[in-house]
């Protein structure tokens, strides 16, 4: 919770079931009984004086996999919750009408201190959106409201910010 984060001896950000990630779940195609808890994740990279941070709440209809190995990390469980089953295959098997259109939005932000213009930030967000497709399956369904934003904290017009070409 917020008090745990505030009283922590670490400079690392608190992640998981906190803030917007509190109610986040994945693998919800068969309802919450077979879904799995997810949450909020944060990752930062430094390049010289520049920092790029991604913060994402994973609240997807689909399964979550490691983008390098394809190993499922979280998602739809079988009815006795002993193993994972494919959310994508289940979606195709059970195309019967059901209310899947609420509670499935993975939302994120890419934040940097480098000076990017609006078009460049839009491109950064577009590239970051591709990460969803590498890790969430299925992604971008009619039942998902996935989105990602990009923003810069660089000041404009005072000569402090350095422009970075992408």
Report each predicted region and the residues it spans.
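A structural signal for small-residue-enriched, beta-sheet-centric alpha/beta enzyme cores
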Residues: 1-166
């Amino acid at each position: 919770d917020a008090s745990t984060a505030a009283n922590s001896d670490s400079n690392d950000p608190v992640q998981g079931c906190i803030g917007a990630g509190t109610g986040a779940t994945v693998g919800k195609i068969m309802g919450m009984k077979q879904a799995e808890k997810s949450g909020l994740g944060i990752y930062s990279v430094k390049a010289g004086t520049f920092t790029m941070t991604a913060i994402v709440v994973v609240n997807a209809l689909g399964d979550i996999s490691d983008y390098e190995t394809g190993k499922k990390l979280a998602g739809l469980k079988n009815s006795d919750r002993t193993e994972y089953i494919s959310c994508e295959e289940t979606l195709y098997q059970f195309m019967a009408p059901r209310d899947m259109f609420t509670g499935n939005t993975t939302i994120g932000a890419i934040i940097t201190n480098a000076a990017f213009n609006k078009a460049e930030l839009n491109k950064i967000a577009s590239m970051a959106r591709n990460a969803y497709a590498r890790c969430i399956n299925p992604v971008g369904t009619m039942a998902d409201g996935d989105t990602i934003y990009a923003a810069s904290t660089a000041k404009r017009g005072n000569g402090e910010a350095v422009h970075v070409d992408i």
